[in-house]
Amino acid sequence: MIPLVHDFTGERVLVVGGGPVGARKARRFAREAEVVVLSPTFEAESYGDSQRLRAAPDPEEIPDWLDRIDPALVVAATDSTDLNDAIERAADERGILSNRADRSGSRNLGQVVVPATVRDDPVVAAISTGASSPALSRHLRQELESTISGAGSMAELTGSLRDELATVSSETRRAALRAVVDSEAVWKALDTESANARQVATDVIADLTGDSV
């Protein structure tokens, strides 16, 4: 499998199944997409900013639900293999991406694995074991949380500096931005939410290039 990042802004995601797994999937996608959760019952859990539809569709009714909701992605999170099979089949027939919460290992065309993620916006790090070991994914995610702390602020800072360095040669620009990213002083300033983090970064660039930004 090859990891891809998909922008679900403005897209619709259908989660079939209102148990703990369905709730977790709904919360995750609701950060960005319009989420509809379809289930006969709902747990006393948060489903994020999602719409809940109370219904118990049979496998034969799944195609009609997909046609009605028209999602970009459908998540099969029920405890019925027959129902999950029907969801997968109907999604495949319509060219809709699908994710099965009850399946690990290899996937067919059009089926996706939703990896564990660590966020420090706009930075996102994803970890996947191909759904073969969710426990390992969770462990690695916890390890990464401290590693990328502050990466979001660094991304915003270097993105701004890159725009300001647009007139210098690409080689000099890359070297300057790498120096900022490698600078412990800049990371420390960002970690303490210091207002002078930008000045520290420009000083690093000036030391390298002999010019100020």
Question: Where does each model-flagged region fall?
Answer:
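Conserved acidic residues
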Residues: 55-57
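An accessory alpha-helical subdomain
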Residues: 129-213
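ADP-ribose/adenylate-binding Rossmann-like module
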Residues: 73-80, 84-113
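Hydrophobic, well-ordered beta-alpha structural blocks that scaffold small-molecule cofactor pockets
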Residues: 1-48
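Short amphipathic alpha-helix with an adjacent loop that forms part of the alpha/beta core around
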Residues: 59-69
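E1/E1-like adenylate-forming module used to activate ubiquitin-like modifiers
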Residues: 100-149
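Structural motif
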Residues: 12, 72-73
